[in-house]
Curated annotation (Swiss-Prot):
The lineage of its organism: Bacteria, Pseudomonadati, Pseudomonadota, Gammaproteobacteria, Pasteurellales. Keywords: Isoprene biosynthesis, Lyase, Metal-binding. This is 2-C-methyl-D-erythritol 2,4-cyclodiphosphate synthase. GO terms for biological process: isopentenyl diphosphate biosynthetic process, methylerythritol 4-phosphate pathway; terpenoid biosynthetic process. Its cofactor is a divalent metal cation. It comes from Actinobacillus pleuropneumoniae serotype 7 (strain AP76).
Length: 158
């Protein structure tokens, strides 16, 4: 049996912290306003994985009202969510992440992002795709106010 999940997340810029995307620190003058580290891509991917096996979403599993997740490393959240996916009898066939950002440019970091996700999901890097696009200066991402991300996860029964 196969299962598919979709995730979406968005965070605004504005906090003095490192900008984390796909578990990689991307040099930029500001970070995200968020309860955790704000890694918009890993949050979308976590939602996709959880959604594929009907385990809700990142907010259900790691509520922002719980102080233990304050400034949490989103890689740890992803790894825990994937542990729960595996407990349901599924593993990743492939994942696809789309980062929607006017700035900063993601291209120099894509390979590292793919490898980081592959490491966290215990899969081959060829099962992980990460890409970035702009909104041609339209909307909040186009104005440089934040970043959005979509993710899709295809899971197969172990």
């Amino acid at each position: 049996m196969i299962r598919i999940g979709h995730g979406f997340d968005v965070h605004a810029f504005g906090q003095d912290r490192p900008l984390m995307i796909c578990g990689v620190e991307v040099p930029y003058h500001t970070g995200f306003i968020a309860h955790s580290d704000g890694d918009v891509a890993l949050h979308a991917l976590t939602d996709a994985l959880l959604g594929a096996v009907a385990l809700g979403d990142i907010g259900k599993l790691f509520p922002d009202t719980d102080m233990q997740y304050k400034n949490a490393d989103s890689r740890k959240l992803l790894i825990e969510a994937y542990r729960q996916v595996r407990a349901q009898g599924y593993k990743v066939a492939n994942v696809d992440v789309t980062i929607i950002a006017q700035a900063p440019k993601m291209r120099p970091y894509i390979d590292q992002m793919r490898q980081t996700i592959a490491d966290d999901l215990q899969c081959d890097v060829m099962q992980v795709n990460v890409k970035a696009t702009t909104t041609e200066k339209l909307g909040f991402t186009g104005r440089g106010e934040g970043i959005a991300c979509e993710a899709v996860a295809l899971l197969i029964k172990q």
